[in-house]
From Swiss-Prot:
Active-site residues, record numbering mapped to chain: 66 (proton acceptor)
Any Gene Ontology CC annotation: cytosol
UniProt entry keywords in alphabetical sequence: Amino-acid biosynthesis, Aromatic amino acid biosynthesis, NADP, Oxidoreductase
Chain's role: Involved in the biosynthesis of the chorismate, which leads to the biosynthesis of aromatic amino acids. Catalyzes the reversible NADPH linked reduction of 3-dehydroshikimate (DHSA) to yield shikimate (SA).
Positions with a binding annotation for shikimate: 15-17, 62, 87, 103, 222
Sequence positions that bind NADP(+): 127-131, 151-156, 220, 244
Record EC number: 1.1.1.25
Pathway: Metabolic intermediate biosynthesis; chorismate biosynthesis; chorismate from D-erythrose 4-phosphate and phosphoenolpyruvate: step 4/7
GO BP annotation list: amino acid biosynthetic process; aromatic amino acid family biosynthetic process; chorismate biosynthetic process; shikimate metabolic process
Annotated protein name in UniProt: Shikimate dehydrogenase (NADP(+))
Quaternary assembly: Homodimer.
Species, as recorded: Shewanella baltica (strain OS195)
Record CDD domains: NAD_bind_Shikimate_DH
GO-annotated molecular function: NADP binding; shikimate 3-dehydrogenase (NADP+) activity
Amino acid sequence: MTDRYAVFGNPISHSKSPFIHGQFAAPTQESLTYEAILAPVDGFEASLTAFFNAGGKGANVTVPFKEQAFALCDSISPEAKLAGAVNTLSLLADGTIRGDNTDGLGLVADLIANLGSLQDQRVLLIGAGGAARGCILPLLNAEIAQLTISNRTHTKAQLLVDIFTSVDNGAYASKVTAVEMSELAGEFDIIINSTSASLAGELPPLPAHIITTQTVCYDMMYGASVTAFNQWALSQGAAKAIDGLGMLVGQAAKSFTLWRGVEPDTQVVLTLLRDKLMAEPK
């Protein structure tokens, strides 16, 4: 029997998820289909219910439904709880829905694939939206030395710090801080841009001196050409600049493993996806 999976979003026609999961399924001999479903902005719950009633086993969720999906879950993972959003839904044997957030796990997996280890790294996270919030716990669990969060609106960055310093009886309190962009100083091993500024060819207002020849920069956005943030980082002398395509594949792999109990080969699929992206009409 072929199991059915999908990704829900609005818009959704641009989604790479059907291609990614199709590539995961073939070599692992998993019998499944995976489709993109456009849900009405005011009709996500009805669309999801219809999907599960028709035999759907699990689903990914993207903009703008991640918070709505969170509210529909009967149980959630620690990552999803702290992110306040889910991107992966699983219909369990008892008919309940479990929610996970694999975005941050995908980010960490891609960083480790590129850098080897995140242990004792000093990390600067730019942005304080949902993308940033979803990756904080996985970064901390990767045993980084320090996480600095900086955002155009400082109060939003401080709010994230307050949330995560209260986790596990303050276990992370000494590791997470919020700093105004204009007051950023010192050196960072890794700088992660979680904002969508690159999609518009724009940059967060960052001081150039935070980039050194040892700094690795990571933009969660991606495209056929180098993103605006990564162009800027390289022009300032960064050691390396990585885009978010590997994060996309990584989070999909974590979802696939949750559903199927099989770990797919992400690097092969990442290469195929990169080639596909480069071949698309500009």
